[in-house]
Amino acid sequence: MSASPTADLLILGAGPVGLTLAAECRKHGISFRIVDQNPTHSVYSKALAIWSNTIEHLAGLGLAEKFLEAGCPVRRGIFQDNGKKIAEIPITEGLDSPYPQPFVLPQSDTEALLGRHLAAQGVIVERNTRALDVRPQEDHVEVDLQKPGGAETVRTRWLA
């Protein structure tokens, strides 16, 4: 395997957390690489809602409006038993936030929005790339990656 110098941070995984971390790194000038073993972002969702504090965080990245436009606000929860409403709970009461309600937005859409945001800034998610081995060292981490073109050993200060 070829050893290659790399960025300060290697992000393994381009799901919502990895993509958000990449956006934060880009915003703050931290050098990074982001890799994912999948050929594209997921078309399946493991999560359907984005809550107030997440929208507040996305606002700091300049993304809140795009997410709000793509999602559907949830203002109340309705519980039913055999088709009969048994309870209704307002979701927004007591939330001290500029975004007082959660939004329904499939995880696949979340990943697509974050991916487009990063691509517009020139960030490339290295797809079809997976970690084979991780070796912590005294002042860095070595990670063996399997890529479509072969294997690569990456040295990085931090691993996420």
Task: Provide a role label for each language-model segment.
Residues R127-E142:
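A conserved short coil-to-beta-strand element within the FAD-binding core of flavoproteins
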Residues A14-G15, Q37, Q107:
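Glycine-rich Rossmann-fold phosphate-binding loop(s) that bind the pyrophosphate
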Residues V43-Q121, L132-R135:
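Active-site-adjacent segment of FAD-dependent monooxygenases/related oxidoreductases
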Residues E24-A47:
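Glycine-rich FAD pyrophosphate-binding loop
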Residues S2-V17:
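Beta1/beta-strand and adjacent pyrophosphate-binding region of the FAD-binding site
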Residues P5-A7, G149-W158:
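Core beta-strand elements of the Rossmann-like FAD/NAD(P) dinucleotide-binding domain
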Residues I11-L12, P106, V154-A160:
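Short hydrophobic core segments
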